[in-house]
């Protein structure tokens, strides 16, 4: 009782934002160590308590073998998700899914259709700050991952073409399908995100000359079937979702409980495609699922030897980065990070700056900001509080004034919205 609350407040984050599975550091600050008993004493004390159990037991609190203390419900959510991810990365289970998938796909037309939906070399690029490397077309590789894997995570910053890649991969999947039209569900965490996903997918289909290939996008809650007054959904292990492919956009906003319930509702033969940016829009509730799946910024696009060979054979992409690790995570072949930005030039000032910020390269950030070569960005010293409104007015008001004038003139609504979204 003497220590009740203090170490838990220090060691366990109430609302973890990221790295929720990170182990505690070996060396703790002395100020914390002085107020905490040894870890072994904590474990013994907790396990002696009737409300604390170990994984597999049904008790209010669960203490795992890495000394992480969970509410049972959240341990169960995490366990469900971990089991699903491991099954997707398990070689035997992955091969079973692949064989079932291949029976329903006519792969003889893969090469021709891949070039149709992903024009040759359109996605290859070099970075100005690393001209020695030519990067492959990650969109093509993501499309191949969608064909071969049950779970695929397509990550990337805004403008890298995540939605376009998903739409083209789905179109490719549909063209290669031997059976009836694929049943595809589109979902997002919020209603607004679902509307934008709908617009983006239809626009992407139109660019490759295809009609609408799926129904309306919906929220994840609506997809699962909300039950009034209940934390459970209509769809679950005993009543799986009736879809062949499920695409979830803005997946970084999906929290741990909702993601666990989503994977529980998948049928054994269905594919799950998660789209999102690990550096943006974290979930409000506990559990940074997408961020934990993607790992650190430099951990993406490292594949197994078998998948690397398949990429070369099926797509012709050979400029793959060397794998710096001896052992890769089981789901590494399911994780594709898009890097080429179609919203702005990767070698522009904003392109170089965004990469430096994501890498945490402080020196490079200030070098770019102070460079006279980057005309699209400017370094502004923050004025005193009284001067801040004037600085904002000088830089922003004229844009808003033009927008308001378009509204007053009753211009075409599409033109107004396009201008407002710039």
Question: Model-predicted segments: where are they?
Answer:
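N-terminal pre-P-loop "Q-motif" helix
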Residues: 131-148
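Conserved lysine of the Walker
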Residues: 162
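Inter-Walker segment of RecA-like/P-loop motor cores
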Residues: 184-244
């Amino acid at each position: 009782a003497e220590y009740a609350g203090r170490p838990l407040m220090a060691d366990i984050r109430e609302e973890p934002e990221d790295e929720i599975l990170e182990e505690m550091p070996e060396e703790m600050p002395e100020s914390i160590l002085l107020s905490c008993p040894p870890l072994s004493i904590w474990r013994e004390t907790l396990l002696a308590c009737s409300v604390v159990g170990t994984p597999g037991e049904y008790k209010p609190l669960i203490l795992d073998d890495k000394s992480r203390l969970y509410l049972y419900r959240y341990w169960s959510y995490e366990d469900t998700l971990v089991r699903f991810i491991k099954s997707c990365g398990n070689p035997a289970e992955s091969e079973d899914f692949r064989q079932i998938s291949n029976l329903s796909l006519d792969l003889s037309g893969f090469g021709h259709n891949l070039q149709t939906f992903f024009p040759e070399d359109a996605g290859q690029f070099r970075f100005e700050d690393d001209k020695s490397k030519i990067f492959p077309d990650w969109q093509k590789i993501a499309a191949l991952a969608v064909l071969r894997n049950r779970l695929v995570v397509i990550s990337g910053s805004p403008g890298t073409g995540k939605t376009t890649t998903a739409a083209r991969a789905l179109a490719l999947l549909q063209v290669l399908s031997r059976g009836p039209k694929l049943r595809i569900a589109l979902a997002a965490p919020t209603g607004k995100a679902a509307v934008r996903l709908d617009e983006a997918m239809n626009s992407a289909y139109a660019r490759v000359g295809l009609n609408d290939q799926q129904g309306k996008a919906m929220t994840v809650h609506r997809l699962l079937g909300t039950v009034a007054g209940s934390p459970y959904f209509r769809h679950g292990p005993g009543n799986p979702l009736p879809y062949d492919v499920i695409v979830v956009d803005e997946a970084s906003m999906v929290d741990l409980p909702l993601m666990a319930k989503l994977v529980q509702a998948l049928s054994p033969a269905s594919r799950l495609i998660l789209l999102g940016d690990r550096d943006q829009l974290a979930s409000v509730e506990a559990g940074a699922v997408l961020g934990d799946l993607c790992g650190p910024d430099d951990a993406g696009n490292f594949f197994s030897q078998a998948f690397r060979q398949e990429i070369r054979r099926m797509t012709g992409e050979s400029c793959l980065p060397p794998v710096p690790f001896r052992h890769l995570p089981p789901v590494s072949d399911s994780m594709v990070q898009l890097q080429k930005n179609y919203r702005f030039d990767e070698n522009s000032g904003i392109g170089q700056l965004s990469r430096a910020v994501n890498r945490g390269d402080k020196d490079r950030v200030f070098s770019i900001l102070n460079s006279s070569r980057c005309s699209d960005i400017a370094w502004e010293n923050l004025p005193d509080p009284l001067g801040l409104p004037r600085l904002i007015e000088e830089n922003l008001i004229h844009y808003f004034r033009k927008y308001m004038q378009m509204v007053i003139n009753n211009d075409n609504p599409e033109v107004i919205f396009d201008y407002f979204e710039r």
